[in-house]
From Swiss-Prot:
Disulfide bonds: none annotated. It comes from Cytophaga hutchinsonii (strain ATCC 33406 / DSM 1761 / CIP 103989 / NBRC 15051 / NCIMB 9469 / D465). Belongs to the UPF0301 (AlgH) family. GO terms for cellular component: cytosol. InterPro entries: AlgH-like (IPR003774). This is UPF0301 protein CHU_1773.
Length: 182
């Protein structure tokens, strides 16, 4: 069932290079559509390379999706809503909020940088678009905890999540990117 906090795992034969082997955290789903962030698409860009002001901290950015790639978004893990205007997703997971307050919390050490992930862009679907893609078997819906979202090696997340699901999903985790090359 599609609800915020679920992940969407792209089928290995999706045929869309943007979402190839992606794991998308669903941050919102309603009658108007859905949006989320790709958790496993890191970039070589850093937060200070895209902001006009230089921050006192540095972190690599992730590609959140193909929409609004000139905008910065963020996810964070926090025991309670300490960041102003952050939106609760599930458990200890939130997205967005007051960026100035976020910078202060990180500088004070109230919020650890390891509990933040910054994204350029987001993944978005219009009304019924995601449901249509699910009918076409483009995505697998699964659960994930926030600890597994903030792994040090996100590039292997797609394969690791499928493998941990077992059964046929474990077999899918070994599906080649281009089976014609086998």
């Amino acid at each position: 069932m599609l609800t915020k906090g679920k992940i969407l795992i792209s089928e290995p034969y999706l045929g869309d290079s943007t979402f190839e082997r992606s794991v998308v955290l669903l941050c919102e789903h309603n009658d108007s559509g859905a949006f989320g962030f790709m958790l496993n698409k890191s970039t070589t860009l850093t937060i200070n390379s895209v902001l006009e002001e230089q921050l006192t901290f540095e972190q690599n950015l992730f590609l959140g999706g193909p929409v609004a790639q000139d905008s910065l978004f963020f996810l964070l893990r926090q025991d309670r809503a300490i960041l102003k205007d952050s939106v609760h997703i599930k458990d200890d997971l939130y997205w967005g909020g007051d960026f100035e307050h976020l910078k202060t919390l990180i500088q004070e050490g109230t919020l650890e940088l390891d509990n933040c992930r910054f994204f350029l862009g987001y993944s978005g679907w219009g009304e019924d678009q995601l449901e249509y893609e699910l009918e076409k078997h483009s995505w697998i819906i699964a659960d994930i905890n926030s600890e597994d979202m903030f792994v040090k090696n996100p590039e292997s997340m797609w394969q690791n999540v499928l493998r941990s699901m077992g059964g046929d999903y474990k077999v899918l985790s070994n599906y080649p990117i281009d089976p014609r090359l086998n």
